[in-house]
């Protein structure tokens, strides 16, 4: 990023932030869709049953832990790749 001037750095940072927000929204949407589909079965009432609430909590925790693990592995791969290129 040293090759970019101040304005270019700001524009680049803005693009990165927009991508991060888009990725976060995609993650959130996938979480909602998956857990709703897997856990909500009773449409006779507007409230969740205790079973549905428990399922949603477990589903969301599992989904977020999985996403965190994937992110960590991605960072590890990037670090390894960066070290390989830095030789």
Swiss-Prot record:
Pfam family, one: zf-Tim10_DDP
BP term (GO), one: protein insertion into mitochondrial inner membrane
Family affiliation: Belongs to the small Tim family.
Effect on the protein of changing residue 67 to C: Impairs the import of mitochondrial carrier proteins into mitochondria
SUPFAM superfamilies with a match to the protein in the record: Tim10-like
N-acetylmethionine modification, residue list: 1
GO MF annotation: an example: protein transporter activity
Membrane topology: Peripheral membrane protein
Annotated InterPro entries: Mito_inner_translocase_sub (IPR050673), Tim10-like (IPR004217), Tim10-like_dom_sf (IPR035427)
Assembly behavior: Heterohexamer; composed of 3 copies of TIM9 and 3 copies of TIM10, named soluble 70 kDa complex. Associates with the TIM12 component of the TIM22 complex, whose core is composed of TIM18, TIM22 and TIM54. Interacts with the transmembrane regions of multi-pass transmembrane proteins in transit.
Keyword line: Acetylation, Chaperone, Disulfide bond, Membrane, Metal-binding, Mitochondrion, Mitochondrion inner membrane, Protein transport, Translocation, Transport, Zinc
Function: Mitochondrial intermembrane chaperone that participates in the import and insertion of multi-pass transmembrane proteins into the mitochondrial inner membrane. Also required for the transfer of beta-barrel precursors from the TOM complex to the sorting and assembly machinery (SAM complex) of the outer membrane. Acts as a chaperone-like protein that protects the hydrophobic precursors from aggregation and guide them through the mitochondrial intermembrane space. Compared to TIM10, it may have a strong structural role.
Broad class of where this protein is predominantly found: mitochondrion
Name of the featured protein: Mitochondrial import inner membrane translocase subunit TIM9
Outcome of substituting residue 52 to G: In tim9-19; impairs the import of mitochondrial carrier proteins into mitochondria
Bridged cysteine pairs (disulfide): 35-59, 39-55
Motif Twin CX3C motif, chain ranges: 35-59
